[in-house]
């Protein structure tokens, strides 16, 4: 494992803080999905949409920072080139996950376009993919710098 002096305490604190924010957004979406929908589908949909919008914003911030020219991904490619394929995978996931969130938000914006059950299924799959993405990101940090960035709790 490499150590990279450019991954300093300040960087790690920021990464951990953003991970915690993303985790909170994931939990908010899960909470919105778990709320009762029968007889109050409009309010339920608004709550799910608001939580998903917040998650999308937090995820896009994560992508912007991770993929910045001086971000974790660029530093990983420089310091641990053996992990470049993992970085590439994470960046492909960024594109796929952002597009999926956009599609779900578009669907939620159209009244009657779907059912609460279908939304629950689709968004739950999204949450699972995001959780796995976070796990891969955590593994990458550990493999590159022997740093445990934690789960965000």
Name each model feature, range by range.
Residues 1-153:
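Small-residue-biased structural context
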């Amino acid at each position: 494992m490499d150590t990279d002096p450019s991954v300093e305490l300040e960087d790690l604190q920021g990464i951990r803080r953003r991970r915690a924010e993303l985790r909170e957004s994931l939990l908010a979406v899960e909470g919105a999905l778990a709320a009762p929908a029968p007889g109050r589908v409009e309010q339920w949909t608004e709550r799910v949409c608001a939580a998903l919008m917040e998650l999308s914003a937090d995820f896009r911030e994560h992508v912007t920072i991770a993929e910045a020219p001086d971000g974790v991904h660029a530093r990983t490619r420089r310091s641990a080139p053996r992990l470049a394929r993992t970085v590439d995978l994470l960046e492909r996931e960024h594109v796929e996950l952002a597009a999926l969130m956009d599609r779900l938000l578009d669907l939620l914006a159209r009244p009657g376009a779907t059912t609460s059950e279908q939304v629950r299924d689709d968004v739950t799959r999204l949450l699972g993919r995001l959780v796995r993405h976070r796990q891969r990101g955590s593994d990458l940090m550990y493999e590159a710098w022997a740093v445990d960035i934690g789960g965000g709790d």
